[in-house]
Regions:
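S-adenosyl-L-methionine
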Residues: 1-43, 53-61, 75-77, 84, ...
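Conserved proline-anchored active-site loop of SAM-dependent methyltransferases
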Residues: 44-58, 67-72, 247-267, 334
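Class I S-adenosyl-L-methionine-dependent methyltransferase module
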Residues: 64, 68-220, 265-310, 317
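Flexible, glycine-/basic-rich loop-and-beta segments that form/coincide
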Residues: 90, 378-416
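Conserved acidic residues
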Residues: 237
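Short conserved loop adjoining the S-adenosyl-L-methionine
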Residues: 240-247
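Conserved Class I SAM-dependent methyltransferase catalytic core
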Residues: 299-362
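Class I S-adenosyl-L-methionine
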Residues: 343-391
């Protein structure tokens, strides 16, 4: 199956936890539980549908799909893209030509009268000139042109497809039209992905997203697919839906609960506002400093869909209740080693339900546009596969444990290392560019070009769990803990050939950039001065990075001035 086809890759909202990048792994998990191959009509349950990409995969596989999400925007999007087949368009809109004409009509509407403008009034600047906006006094979630586009299209949808008209055709026309607008509104937004904050100026400091942000909002023809089986979408709490007993048993249930503290109702409040279109006033009141009191103007009713999975004290119990309530032969769970519920607890809860297997993938964690001086930037997203008709086997759980441990060790090989720390935990063989350590009576040898980066061994899967744990601990204790430590290591290595000096100097700008945040301001200027002083000792090599260092400095000044 081609996972990059339009239905599985287009018109999918940008989303924290969006499973588009994990879709090959989820597809593999589905194939693993179907040893006789995919067959039409398999009952598939997706209670945390979100962007809907996994349910789209299930529909594409010709499964019977029951999807659910209690956020209004997700419910509308998934109802449109799951419940409507491509072949339904002529019966809903009379013809494909009529739908294209409707989209042309939406895209060429005049601006709404001032009293009917909502997004343009509260969530966008008063001027079309992006260089004259003031993020302190007005919200900058959209350009004025795109805010006006949202207003006029959304107002027109309510006018020609009134919400109180409950006929099938009217509701389907309405849902698909709103879904197309929601995708555009989620895409052409002046944010890093969520609506809790907007960039201070369009495109942020780097201006690297201006093309996306400034591109005009226009509704495109929907990417739909065909299925011979029904796809139904609910809007409910996942556990409540599973516990009602109204749903028959499923062949496969796919669970993707929230991993972290980010609540979807607050993160995507503007999408809910556009979906509901209740136009709750969001006054632009200023405080005594002349700055907006309520910068994001988040809907107060977001707490109605507040998820227990986003709280450390509640997440584990919520997950356990859900797993116990699900009636399915196979349960596929995607979660993260960086999630609120520790991996061991997730594994144990799953093992109480049945036999457990695992698939893993390295996945960059969500950082909301910022990097940390000291945090690792990689974690492991994994998929656990539960066979609820078998009891958990010790050997299966041992494989699960080892798989995660191997991945954790491999991720450490992506870090940079302190040569001094390495010498405390390994024997350094400088003549042969390697480090060695005796682990479980065997001498382990790891290649390293410079004692700053390490090459993973090709035999890592053959190590015992005990050996992996010891290796993990030694590598963890030897790794650079901060970007400052990395910069120091780089500078300590600037004593080799011209080629080597050039190689290390080129690492400096991106490493220095990680310190260009207010909380590291003092450290940034200390290291900036040290970096600039390198020009005196290495003038020709420094010329290779001079412009990049200046760009980092300029970016830092912009951040610090705000």
């Amino acid at each position: 199956m081609e996972l990059r086809e339009p239905y599985l890759s287009s018109q999918i909202i940008a989303y924290i936890g969006n499973k588009r990048g994990l879709l090959p792994l989820i597809h593999e998990a589905i194939l693993n539980v179907l040893p006789n191959g995919v067959r039409p009509g398999i009952r598939f349950f997706d209670p945390f549908a979100g962007s809907g990409v996994v349910s789209r995969l299930a529909k594409k596989l010709n499964f019977e799909v029951i999807a659910n999400d209690w956020e209004e925007y997700s419910f509308i999007i998934n109802t449109a893209y799951l419940s409507i087949n491509k072949s339904d368009i002529p019966s809903i809109f009379e013809s494909e030509r009529r739908l294209k004409d409707l989209l042309y009509h939406f895209n060429n509407l005049p601006d709404s009268h001032e009293e009917e403008q909502y997004i343009a009034k509260y969530y966008a600047p008063s001027t079309v000139d992006i260089d004259k906006v003031d993020f302190r006094k007005e919200r900058l979630f959209y350009t004025r042109q795109n805010a006006l586009a949202i207003d006029k299209i959304r107002n027109e949808i309510d006018r020609i497809f009134p919400p109180k008209k409950k006929t099938y055709v009217n509701q389907r026309r309405r849902q698909l039209s709103i879904a197309l607008l929601l995708y555009e509104a989620a895409t052409h937004t002046n944010t890093s992905g969520v609506f809790k904050a907007y960039h201070k100026g369009f495109g942020g400091h780097n201006k690297d997203a201006l093309t996306r942000i400034l591109a005009p909002i226009k509704l495109r023809y929907p990417c739909l697919c065909e299925s011979n089986y029904p796809c139904v979408v609910y809007k409910d709490d996942a556990t409540d839906l599973a516990q009602y007993g109204l749903l028959d048993e499923f062949d496969i249930a796919y669970l993707d609960p929230p991993y972290n503290q980010h609540q979807y109702g607050s993160n995507y409040h503007l999408l809910n506002t556009i979906a509901v279109w209740d136009k709750i006033p969001a006054p632009l009141e200023l405080n005594e400093k002349g700055v907006l009191r309520d910068k994001a103007a988040i809907r107060k009713d977001w707490i109605e869909t507040r998820s227990d999975y986003c709280y450390k004290v509640k997440a584990e119990a919520a997950f356990k209740d859900l797993i116990e309530s699900i009636r399915a032969h196979y349960i596929i769970v995607s979660y993260s080693t960086d999630g609120i519920i520790p991996f061991e607890d997730v594994k144990d809860i799953c093992a109480d339900k049945g036999d457990v297997n695992i698939l893993t993938n390295e996945y960059v964690k969500y950082r909301g546009g910022k990097q940390s001086n000291g945090r690792s930037n990689l974690n492991i997203e994994y998929v656990l596969i539960i066979d609820s008709e078998k009891k958990a086997l010790k050997q299966s759980l041992a494989v699960v444990d080892k798989t995660i441990l191997v991945k954790k060790v491999l991720i450490l090989f992506k870090k940079r290392y302190s040569e001094l720390k390495l010498s405390n935990h390994f024997d350094l063989v400088e003549s042969d560019n390697r480090i060695e350590r005796v682990i479980q009576d065997k001498r382990m040898k790891l290649a390293t070009p410079d004692f700053f980066e390490l090459n993973p061994p090709d035999y890592i899967d053959e190590l015992s769990i005990r050996a992996l744990k010891e290796l993990y601990n030694c590598l963890s204790l030897s790794a650079c803990e901060t970007k400052e430590e990395e910069l120091q290591e780089i500078m300590d290595k600037l004593d080799g050939s011209r080629e080597k000096v050039d190689e290390y100097l080129k690492l400096i700008p991106n490493t220095l950039r990680k310190l260009a945040h207010k909380k590291y301001k003092d450290a940034f200027f200390t290291w900036l001065e040290r970096v600039k002083n390198l020009e005196e000792g290495y003038p020709e090599s420094y010329a290779l990075i001079d412009s990049k260092v200046r760009a980092v400095e300029e970016q830092a000044y912009k951040r610090f001035s705000n």
